[in-house]
Each structure stands twice: as C-alpha cells, then as structure tokens.
Design a protein with these regions (language model features):
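Membrane-interface coil-to-helix junctions
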Residues: 1-72, 94-117
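Short intrinsically disordered, low-complexity coil segments enriched in acidic
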Residues: 1-7, 173-183
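Residue-level recognition of short, well-ordered coil/turn positions
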Residues: 20-21, 134-135, 174
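Short, charged/polar low-complexity linear motifs in solvent-exposed/disordered segments
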Residues: 42-44, 123, 175
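Transmembrane helix interruption/hinge and helix-loop junction motifs
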Residues: 53-59, 152-156, 172-174
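Membrane-embedded helix bundles of polyisoprenyl
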Residues: 70-81, 86-171, 179-196
C-alpha cells in the first residue's frame, strides 16, 4: 500500500489538482510506465474520487470502510434474493464483510482486491436478477457491477465472468442473450481503458 498505491494516488491527485489533468504516464517508476492501460489503474475506478476530496491516508481508510459496508449490503441482498431469512442474511453478510480473506487483503494493502471483493455478491445478485426479470435495468445493473470489478481488479473480474457465464447456463437459454448484451455494454464502458 505504501510502496505502490499511496505514491500513485499522491501522483495522480497532485497532477489533477495542479491542472495537468489525468496523467497517462507514471514517471515515478523506472523510465516511466503507462497509467491508463495498467490493470490496477486507480483513476478508472469511479469510487476512487474520494481520494480527490480527502487526504490520501483518510481516503484509504474511508475507502476500506465504504467497501466493507458495500460488501455487507451486497451479500445481504444476494441472500435475500434467494429467500434466506433476514436473521441468517445479516449473520452471513457480517461474516462475508469481516472475512479473514478480506482482512488479509486489507493487511497486505491490496486496494484493488478490497474494492473488487465488495462487488462480488452484487455481480451475482445482478445476474440472478437479470435471469428472473430480463429487463434493461437489470442488464445495466449487471454491466455496472461488472465494470466496478473490472476497474478495480482484473483477475477477480476474469473469474467472475467465467463463473457468471456458468450461472447463466443454469437458467433458460434466452438468458445467454442477456449475458451477451450485458457484456457488450460492459465492453462499451471499458473502451476508454482498452483503446490505448
């Protein structure tokens, strides 16, 4: 966290605040590295706007807390969508949002993994919601949650796409069309990252 993410956050924030816009090249490592196509790019994740508002240290703590809350509500929503009782939903959501795996990410300073972990249950909830309702709102929600995972950690995103596809296969055949539409919209969201 202090050797990779903190300096990058500081550099990006300073460049934006100085009026230089979003930096596309990181001059801090070696002879420089591109920032935009970096899979752990910090400024494409929408919730990282918090770092422009708060000091970086406070922003990191706030971001972690915010993602713990998002993880809790995501797991609770997923369980309630599957007819789990409120009490069991709350208990499992607490266990998920305070899981040792997530806290190992926090201790290691893996900001992208922390952020993506929060949206895993939301992706599955949106998938189930899309297979049941098959409407534009459900397609857009799934695309949004997949984009949030994509913009925070690419490996978790890849795993989610595969498992999401397998989940779609358990529903009716026309659900595959919804899967494809949601992923085309996701691709459109991701074009600014993929084009350079």
């Amino acid at each position: 966290l202090t050797e990779f993410f903190w300096p990058l956050l500081y550099y990006i924030k300073q460049q934006i605040l100085l009026g230089n816009g979003i930096p596309l090249w990181n001059t801090m490592f070696f002879s420089g590295t591109p920032l935009l196509p970096d899979p752990q790019n910090l400024f494409i994740y929408p919730l990282n706007i918090i770092f422009l508002i708060l000091p970086i240290d406070a922003g990191i703590l706030t971001s972690i807390l915010l993602h713990l809350i998002i993880a809790f509500f995501g797991m609770y929503q997923l369980l309630r969508a599957n007819d789990t009782s409120k009490k069991v939903g709350i208990i499992i959501a607490i266990l998920y949002s305070l899981s040792p795996k997530l806290f190992s990410y926090i201790e290691a300073g893996h900001l992208g993994l922390i952020q993506s972990w929060a949206f895993i249950p939301w992706v599955y909830w949106a998938t189930i919601n899309l297979c049941r309702k098959k409407n534009l709102k459900s397609i857009l929600l799934l695309s949004l949650f997949l984009y949030l995972v994509y913009s925070s950690h690419i490996l978790i995103f890849a795993i989610l796409v595969v498992t999401n596809f397998l989940l779609f296969l358990t529903f009716k055949k026309n659900a595959i069309v919804m899967f494809l539409i949601s992923h085309i919209i996701l691709l459109l969201f991701s074009l600014p990252i993929l084009i350079p």
